[in-house]
């Protein structure tokens, strides 16, 4: 799975072949087919693993004693995930295959609705737009070529500062 994730991050889903995945893990293409019948199954498995990471952050946030603490935990976790997954962020946010998958994947849509509700305190078209803008800004920043030399700690501090300002949160 990690080989496919890395290749998707580097080449996009469309630019990654099953042969490339097989070569990366040192097996035959037939061995990959034995585990996953189609490339779509690999895409789904990678996407579900990424969604599980987001869900874990959201669950930690929901466990907080008050909405402000939940927002802070969620925002920090989102930024940390984006920074840790910089290599994959481009595929997650701009790959047409993944975008189509996520747009039709009910668990993703439900997860994002929950995330935006915790982060913004409401479920409305405006909240969805604000949430989408914020997540796109975070994702875009971590993969932006002008910021590749910025160390993770500095990037994290700046992203949190700007995201808090966007959300009207203290700090």
Question: What are these model-predicted stretches?
Answer:
Residues 13, 59, 63-66, 146-147, ...:
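Short, flexible helix-adjacent loops and helix caps
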Residues 69, 89-94, 101-171:
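Hydrophobic/aromatic-rich alpha-helical bundle segments in the mid-to-C-terminal region
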Residues 3, 7-41, 45:
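Helix-turn-helix
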Residues 41, 45, 56-87:
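Hydrophobic alpha-helical connector segments
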Residues 3-10, 53-61, 137-144:
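Solvent-exposed, amphipathic alpha-helical segments
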């Amino acid at each position: 799975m990690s080989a496919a994730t890395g290749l998707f991050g580097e080449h996009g889903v469309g630019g990654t072949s099953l042969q490339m995945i097989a070569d990366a893990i040192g097996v035959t293409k037939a061995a990959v087919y034995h585990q996953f019948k189609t490339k779509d199954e690999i895409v789904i498995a990678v996407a579900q693993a990424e969604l599980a990471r987001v869900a874990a952050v959201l669950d930690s946030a929901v466990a907080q004693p008050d909405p402000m603490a939940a927002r802070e935990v969620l925002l920090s976790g989102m930024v940390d995930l984006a920074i840790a997954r910089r290599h994959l962020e481009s595929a997650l946010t701009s790959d047409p295959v993944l975008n189509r998958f996520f747009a039709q994947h009910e668990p993703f849509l439900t997860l994002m609705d929950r995330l935006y509700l915790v982060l913004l305190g409401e479920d409305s078209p405006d909240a969805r737009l604000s949430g989408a803008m914020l997540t796109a800004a975070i994702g875009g920043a971590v993969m932006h070529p002008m910021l590749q030399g910025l160390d993770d700690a500095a990037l994290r501090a700046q992203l949190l500062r700007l995201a808090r300002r966007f959300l009207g949160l203290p700090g």
